[in-house]
Amino acid sequence: IQADPLQVEWGQHIDPDDLKTQLASGDYDVVTLVHNETSCGMMNPLKEIMDVLREFPDVISIIDTVSSFSVVPIPKDDWGIDVILTGSQKALAMPPGLALFSVSERAFQRAVQTEGRGYYFDFLEFRSNHAKGMTPSTPVIPLIHALNYTLNKIFDEGVENRHQRHSRLNQLVH
């Protein structure tokens, strides 16, 4: 797999104009990026990046939201994000061990055309198993119960209230 990094200074976010220049210079299939980098507190301007990606309709977006999922608004469908990945750790404040994802129909269609997808992270395999009420592998049942508890806490607080609380906490430390 060939990958071309878009280098930025440590702690700086991706400049959407730099991304546009890079995408215009080649034949790209996918853009992957970390939305929020916890080690330095940098958050990429995701909406503006997605605005750029709309100009390149053949490019699929895969966004790591492990430390931003549920704490800032990420309107996946409105912004045209193809794949959101997160984990149970960090923003969901759970032990590590669960991978969570949301996949657009466009990304599913791209996966159908992709040979050698493997098994472990094959979204098509997950979708097929989900349709049968199954999982593709042995699930970590205690973490699924913990996720249910965590999601209920988020819904009880209210998603918008959670976003506002995290924004207030962010302002206290920055």
Give, region by region, the residue ranges found by the protein language model:
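General beta-strand structural signal in soluble alpha/beta enzymes
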Residues: D4-L6, T32-L33, S61-T65, I84-G87, ...
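Active-site C-terminal subdomain of aminotransferase-like
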Residues: Q89-L172
